[in-house]
Amino acid sequence: MLDSKLLRTELDETAAKLARRGFKLDVETIRKLEEQRKSIQVEVENLQSTRNSISKQIGQKMAAGDKEGAEEIKKQIGTLGSDLDAKKVELEQVMAQLDEFTLSVPNIPADEVPDGKDENDNVEISRWGEPKTYDFDLKDHVDLGEMGGGLDFASAVKITGARFIVMKGQFARLHRAIAQFMLDLHTEEHGYTEMYVPYLVNSDSLFGTGQLPKFGKDLFHTEPLAEKVNDEEPRKLSLIPTAEVPVTNLVRDTITDEADLPIKMTAHTPCFRSEAGSYGRDTRGLIRMHQFDKVELVQITKPEDSMTALEELTGHAEKVLQLLELPYRKVVLCTGDMGFGARKTYDLEVWVPAQETYREISSCSNMWDFQARRMQARFRRKGEKKPELVHTLNGSGLAVGRTMVAILENNQEADGRIAIPAVLQKYMGGATHIG
C-alpha cells in the first residue's frame, strides 16, 4: 500500500501521479475524511489533557481532607473517560475508512515509465535472436504434442475440465527438464537460494503481496471444514497464483540486518489462477491455463538498490531465453498496463511461430515499498535504531509451460520431430530430439 502520509500531505500531487495509470483518486472524499480525522484527533487529545489535569486534583483534595471534592472529581473523570472512549471509537472508524481507501489505491508509477492506456502503448526496449524461417508447413504446439502423444488435453478435461493438461513420456520429461535447468541456472550462476514453499496460503499472505482484497476473484479458494481436524481449527486457504506470494511473505513481520541484503530467492511451484475476465482468450493449448508451473525470482533489497536490482533480475530471466536460443523481445510496460502493486515492470515476450507474434513469458517488477508496507518487512542500517521498509522485486524466470510452447514450435523439424536445446539435453538423458 502507499504511504498514508502521501494522502495527507501530498494529496493532489499523488492524485496526479495515479491519474497517469488511469486511476481516479477520490480526492474530495479523502480530504473530508482527513478533516474529520484531524478534528476528532484534536478532541481526543483535549479530553486526554483535561482528564490528566483533573486527575492531579484528586491527590490535592485528599491531602486537604476534602473527600467529597475528591469523589466529585472522580465522577468527572469517569464522564471524561466515557467521552474519550466514544471519541476514540469515532477516530477508529474514520481511520478504518481511510485505510479502506488506501488498500484500493495502486502503486505510483516511476517517472520514467511511459504513459499509456493498455498493452498497445508498451514500449519495446530491445530484441534478441531472429525468428527462424521454415520451408514446411508449421504446426502449433497442440498439434505437435498430440501427434507425438505427449500432450493429452482430452484426458485433462475428463479428469478436471478445460484449461488443464496431462503430459506423457518425453513431453513430461521435457517439462521437468525446463524447470530443473532454470533452477540450476539461477542458483548456481545467479546467486539465488532455492526455496520449497507451501502451495496453499492464508489471507494475510495474499494481503501482504497485494492479491487481497482487490483480486480475490482471480484465486482458487478452499472451503474450510465445519469442525476441527486433528485438533486444527477450520481455516480458509487459497492456492497460490504465483510463488511470489509465499516466497515474498518469508520476510513479513521481520527486521533484516543491512548486511544480509539483498536476499535473492527462487522457487519452482505450480500456480493456480481462475483467469477471471479472460473468457474466450487463448482457449487452445498451454498459453493460458488454470494450473501451470513457473520458476519465480524474488529479491529483497535496500531502497537505493531496487532499480538496479530490477535490471539484474530481468537480465537473469533473459539469460534463460538466450541459453535456450529462443528469440524474444523486451518491453517496458506503460502506466496503464502495469500490475496493481508495481512501480516499474519489464515484460519478456518470446516468439511463437504458429501465432507469428511475441507472447509474454516473463514479467519482472519492482514493487518499491508497496508490498513491504503491507507486510511490515523492514531492515535496519548499521548504527541506526529505527528500521526502514525494504523494497521487493519479483519476476518469472520463466513460466515453464510457455517456455515449452516456444521450444516445441521454434524447434520443430519437417519430419515432426522436436530438436531439444543443447542446454537441456543432459536433463533428457542425452537425447537430442523428441519424436
From Swiss-Prot:
L-serine binds at residues 242-244, 296, 396. SUPFAM superfamilies: Class II aaRS and biotin synthetases (SSF55681), tRNA-binding arm (SSF46589). Pathway: Aminoacyl-tRNA biosynthesis; selenocysteinyl-tRNA(Sec) biosynthesis; L-seryl-tRNA(Sec) from L-serine and tRNA(Sec): step 1/1. It comes from the Bacteria. It catalyses: tRNA(Ser) + L-serine + ATP = L-seryl-tRNA(Ser) + AMP + diphosphate + H(+); tRNA(Sec) + L-serine + ATP = L-seryl-tRNA(Sec) + AMP + diphosphate + H(+). Belongs to the class-II aminoacyl-tRNA synthetase family. Type-1 seryl-tRNA synthetase subfamily. PANTHER family: SERINE--TRNA LIGASE (PTHR43697:SF1), SERYL-TRNA SYNTHETASE (PTHR43697). This is Serine--tRNA ligase. The lineage of its organism: Bacteria, Pseudomonadati, Pseudomonadota, Gammaproteobacteria, Vibrionales. The gene is serS.
